[in-house]
């Protein structure tokens, strides 16, 4: 199953703020984690539209594990490499330990998508799904 990924983070190279995955069939997963010392741009453009209270990284990882376990195999699709980096980091739970996932592949596409709420990971992941599926004629 293709899962369309988007993340919001605290500036270029900054820590994760939110992550969303939208499956080809429309199923969605979205979590927000605490952001310590958010950059001014993030305070103005990301924090106000998160739409969800933050949870701990542990809670997010458990939620991610349970959601990913529903799929036989996973192909992550993102439009920005840093989204993939944050996703991979979220799979690591402690030194030498990670979330168990179904077989997993990834790709980064260059595609224009029009989010209904830019800088909200869930809306951006939905827009990425729509753009890719529209391009494929689905």
Language-model regions: role of each:
Residues 22-23, 92-95, 137:
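Short, surface-exposed basic-aromatic patches at helix termini and helix-loop junctions that form
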Residues 66, 86-89, 130, 134:
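Residue-level signal for well-ordered alpha-helical scaffold segments within enzymatic catalytic domains
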Residues 97-116:
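Short, flexible loop segments at boundaries between secondary-structure elements
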Residues 3, 8-82:
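Conserved non-catalytic scaffold segment of RNase H-like nuclease domains
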Residues 84-101:
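Substrate-recognition/cap helix-loop segment adjacent to the acidic, metal-dependent catalytic center
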Residues 80, 111-138:
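Acidic, Mg2+-coordinating catalytic module of metal-dependent nucleases/exonucleases
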């Amino acid at each position: 199953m293709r899962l369309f990924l988007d993340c919001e983070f605290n500036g270029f190279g900054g820590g994760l703020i939110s992550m969303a995955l939208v499956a080809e069939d429309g199923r969605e997963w979205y979590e927000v984690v605490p952001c310590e010392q958010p950059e001014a741009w993030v305070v103005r453009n990301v924090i106000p539209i998160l739409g969800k209270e933050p949870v701990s990284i542990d809670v997010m990882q458990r939620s991610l594990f349970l959601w990913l376990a529903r799929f036989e195999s996973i192909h992550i699709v993102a439009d920005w490499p840093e989204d993939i980096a944050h996703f991979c980091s979220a799979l690591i739970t402690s030194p030498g330990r990670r979330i168990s996932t179904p077989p997993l592949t990834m790709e980064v596409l260059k595609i224009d998508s029009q989010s209904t709420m830019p800088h909200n990971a869930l809306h951006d992941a939905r827009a990425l799904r729509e753009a890719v599926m529209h391009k494929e004629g689905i």
